[in-house]
């Protein structure tokens, strides 16, 4: 069910004897200027508020770690999954989604702004490091996974306006669901930020660990450690509860994924 063979790139290149197409994609992302710029962009907190709050770059690394673990268990392509995870936030603005909303309003007469499509603009046009082509010339599978981060493309007019449908050279079907690797990357994004935003919020004293009791999902986890929690080990308890939460979400995801694959009789990539 995994993607282990590439359809190639929009611009032909010699293959590598030492790295798969998806390893090369990952390496190009890591060495890009846009990836380095993520270190100053934050999820929730302003970058200057503290060294320990997460930035887009630390978030992307955490997403990649979660996604690789899931992909490995399901016998999918870990390199493609990691590539999509590392690249998924390249198009984000500073100041989180508020920054995106402000820029979208400013760019309304030019088609608006969408961070997922901006990610594609960056890797396809704005990162210029090669004589023969613009962008990073990533594999078709990586482009498709990023384009369909939220599922099949519903607004092809917006894609055409901001990127150009002809750019994809008819190598991507906009109406189908993305690969399992892309779906894992997307849900790993949710797992990472839902847990880590809570951890950052507690560390910033915006709310207390005890308040998680109001959320049914966290209540059972909190009660496991309630008797052990005190002022001295409060931070350790926070780490433990967040760690258990991530583990529970991953185990639930794996169980339901295997159940769905069986019930829906998914036998090949085409079935996805």
What are these regions (language model features)?
Residues 79-83, 94-111, 202-210:
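Post-HEXXH active-site segment of zinc metalloproteases
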Residues 14, 68-80, 109:
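Short pre-active-site segment immediately N-terminal to the catalytic Zn-binding motif
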Residues 1-60, 64-70, 113-117, 122-272:
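Histidine-centered, transition-metal-coordinating active-site segments
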Residues 30, 75, 91-94, 110-111, ...:
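Short coil/turn residues that cap or connect secondary-structure elements
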């Amino acid at each position: 069910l995994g993607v282990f063979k590439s359809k190639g790139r929009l611009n032909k290149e010699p293959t590598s004897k030492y790295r798969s197409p998806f390893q090369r994609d990952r390496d190009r992302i890591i060495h890009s200027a846009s990836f380095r710029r993520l270190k100053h962009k934050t999820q929730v907190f302003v970058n200057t508020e503290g060294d320990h709050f997460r930035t887009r770059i630390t978030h992307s690394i955490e997403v990649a770690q979660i996604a690789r673990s899931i992909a490995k268990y399901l016998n999918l392509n870990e390199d493609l999954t990691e590539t999509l995870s590392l690249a998924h936030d390249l198009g984000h603005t500073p100041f989180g989604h508020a920054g995106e909303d402000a820029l979208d309003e400013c760019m309304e007469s030019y088609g608006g702004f969408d961070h997922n499509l901006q990610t594609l603009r960056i890797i396809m046009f704005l990162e210029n490091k090669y004589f023969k082509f613009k962008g990073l010339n990533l594999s078709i599978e990586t482009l498709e996974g990023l384009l369909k981060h939220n599922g099949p493309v519903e607004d092809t007019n917006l894609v055409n306006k901001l990127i150009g449908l002809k750019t994809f050279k008819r190598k991507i079907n906009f109406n189908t669901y993305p690969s399992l690797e892309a779906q894992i990357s997307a849900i790993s994004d949710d797992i990472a930020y839902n847990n880590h935003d809570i951890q950052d919020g507690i560390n910033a004293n915006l709310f207390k660990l005890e308040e998680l009791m109001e959320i049914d999902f966290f209540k059972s986890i909190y009660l496991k450690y309630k008797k052990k929690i005190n002022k001295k080990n409060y931070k350790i308890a926070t780490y433990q509860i967040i760690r258990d939460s991530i583990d529970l979400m991953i185990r639930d995801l794996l169980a339901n994924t295997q159940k769905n694959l069986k019930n829906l009789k998914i036998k090949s990539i085409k079935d996805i």
